UniProtKB/Swiss-Prot annotation:
One of the essential components for the initiation of protein synthesis. Stabilizes the binding of IF-2 and IF-3 on the 30S subunit to which N-formylmethionyl-tRNA(fMet) subsequently binds. Helps modulate mRNA selection, yielding the 30S pre-initiation complex (PIC). Upon addition of the 50S ribosomal subunit IF-1, IF-2 and IF-3 are released leaving the mature 70S translation initiation complex. Its main location: cytoplasm. This is Translation initiation factor IF-1. Residues 1-72 form the S1-like domain. Component of the 30S ribosomal translation pre-initiation complex which assembles on the 30S ribosome in the order IF-2 and IF-3, IF-1 and N-formylmethionyl-tRNA(fMet); mRNA recruitment can occur at any time during PIC assembly. The gene is infA. The keyword Transport does not apply. GO terms for cellular component: cytosol. Signal peptide: none annotated. It is found in: Cytoplasm.
Length: 72
């Protein structure tokens, strides 16, 4: 998928789920399920409940996303 087709949103992690999945509340009050991007796993960036993050989503499935950045 090309980078132009990806939607990016800010959100807050509300719950940690099994298999490195997270429940995220987006800034537009939608809740999605997200997993960490491979680059974040490789650099061992921890994501905890309450963290402010950036999520990228495909326009084809707006219920799932990938966490690409954790704000400091």
């Amino acid at each position: 998928m090309s980078k132009e087709e990806v939607l990016e949103f800010s959100g807050i992690v509300t719950e940690l789920l099994p298999n490195a999945m997270f429940r995220v509340k987006l800034e537009n009050d939608h809740e999605i399920i997200a997993h960490t991007a491979g680059r974040m796993r490789k650099n061992r960036i921890r994501v905890l409940a309450g963290d402010k993050i950036m999520v990228e989503m495909t326009p084809y499935d707006l219920t799932k996303g990938r966490i690409i950045y954790r704000y400091k």
